[in-house]
Amino acid sequence: IMQPSPPHEAWEYTVEHIAINAVMAGARPEYLPVIIAAMECLTEESTFTHMMSSEGSFTLAIMVSGPIARELKMNSGVGLLGHGWRANNTIGRAVRLSLINIGYLWPGEIDMALIGRPSSHTFYTFAENLEQSPWETFNVGLGYKPEDSCVTVDTVMGGIGMRIYGGGVVEPWDVKQVLDSIV
């Protein structure tokens, strides 16, 4: 049984609950360890509470590093956030369905994003590009061995350049506006 941190400790979930949502998402059984690892990451208060209850349009980035990404045929290159990549899409979708069905994360109730969350159906789920990266792998940078697989979940701004005002009014920004606000 896994329990999220405050204020979400009122609900708890099991691997069975996650597996049910994974099946609904169309995930293959071999994806389950990655989905469970992502859900375990979300039990940390700093990730879960901030992103999920924010009025900003943050979204989750779920990065898989290590050999499991290749085994699951996750995309780490061109189009990695696009359609057609079953592992990427269904892992992210299983996490999202788990948050909705187990954590009751309904828009306008707990999920308060004013304009929604980009990629909220699948989040930004991708594999680290081990073949083309000139740097050491992310999992090695965290102190793991190259043969270890890791799942990292973090919040990212939804990839849009907009200011959000009360009531959902938005305004696009440009570089000059950003620099003017700094100066």
Residue map of PLM features:
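N-terminal core-entry segment
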Residues: I1-M74, G79
